[in-house]
């Protein structure tokens, strides 16, 4: 269970982030790897203060739940980031003779977006709580999101980068948007026609079935021109900075009776964004019970990416 306090945020949206793999690791006392698609069976929200049906404050506790879009683009972008991270580590380890040099709980972990990165460790970064609202103990723990190091120039200067899935790169490339990076380095389709050679519209066989020369030219133009360009943006992939950089809303609703049950969805990497808008100035404690589907990965349904 997670808890959200909305004091002082009346009429404004409060954004929270949670990492299911992180929460599971803390409450189960063993590592749950992030590189999986975690299946959420259902979520239930409860609130201390809520709008009654017919009341003008009905939208007081509006909830949106969003995730990384479950697409081949996001999957390939994640895999490219993972392979870059892993291969670099392997190359360095090959140059050493020290056994067991890699950290015992090493795992490839990324942020949902750059805001998630900058909010990490703050009250915007949700952690599990018990029935009394006590946050899980994190003393002595180490949940470190992955970094990669690139060479800035031939002089040997290096740059360390965090990694996030959605949106633009951070300022000075402090964090790399994996989907944007994937799109920047991948060959794309052509938008022009495959050939511009002239066609003789008076050719006898070309005019078979056509009433006249003009009809043949029109039909041929439709055949060659319509749907020649792809049915999507050529240069920008969904999830980069110029094409739907936000997370995908998978559930939404209004807590108007003190309780809001929502259905299931799949959270890539177990990453979720929760947006809540409340009309109450006083502290409104909203609790979120996340029920995961049972499965074969340490008790939960979480297929490897």
Language-model features: locations:
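N-terminal leader/pro-regions and domain N-caps
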Residues: 1-28, 303-304
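Solvent-exposed loop and beta-edge segments used for protein-protein assembly and interaction
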Residues: 32-39, 57-59, 266
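A short beta-strand element within beta-rich, extracytoplasmic domains
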Residues: 35-51, 272-275
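Intrinsically disordered, low-complexity segments enriched in Gly and acidic/Ser/Thr residues
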Residues: 199-261
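Short, hydrophobic/proline-enriched secondary-structure or compact coil segments at domain edges
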Residues: 265-281
């Amino acid at each position: 269970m997670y808890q959200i306090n909305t004091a002082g945020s009346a009429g404004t949206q409060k954004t929270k982030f949670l990492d299911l793999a992180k929460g599971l690791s803390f409450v189960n006392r063993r590592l749950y790897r992030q590189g999986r698609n975690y299946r959420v069976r259902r979520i239930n929200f409860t609130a201390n203060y809520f709008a009654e049906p017919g009341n003008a404050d009905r939208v007081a506790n509006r909830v949106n739940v969003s995730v990384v879009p479950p697409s081949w683009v996001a999957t390939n972008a994640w895999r490219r980031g993972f392979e870059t991270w892993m291969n670099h580590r392997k190359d360095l380890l090959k140059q050493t003779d020290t056994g067991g040099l890699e950290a015992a709980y090493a795992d490839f972990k990324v942020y949902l977006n750059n805001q998630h990165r900058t909010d990490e460790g703050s009250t915007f970064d949700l952690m599990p709580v018990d029935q009394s609202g006590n946050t899980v103990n994190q003393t002595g723990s180490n949940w470190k999101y992955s970094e990669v190091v690139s060479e800035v120039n031939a002089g040997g200067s290096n740059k360390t980068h965090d990694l996030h899935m959605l949106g633009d790169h951070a300022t000075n490339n402090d964090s790399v948007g994996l989907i944007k990076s994937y799109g920047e380095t991948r060959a794309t389709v052509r938008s022009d026609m495959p050939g511009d050679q002239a066609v003789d519209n008076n050719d006898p066989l070309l005019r078979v079935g056509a009433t006249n020369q003009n009809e043949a030219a029109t039909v041929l133009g439709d055949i060659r021109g319509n749907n020649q360009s792809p049915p999507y943006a050529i240069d920008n992939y969904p999830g980069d900075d110029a094409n739907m950089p936000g997370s995908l809303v998978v559930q939404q609703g209004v807590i108007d009776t003190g309780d809001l049950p929502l259905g299931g969805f799949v959270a890539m990497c177990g990453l979720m964004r929760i947006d809540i808008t409340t009309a109450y100035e006083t502290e409104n404690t909203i609790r979120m019970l996340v029920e995961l589907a049972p499965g074969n990965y340490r008790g939960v349904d979480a297929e490897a990416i």
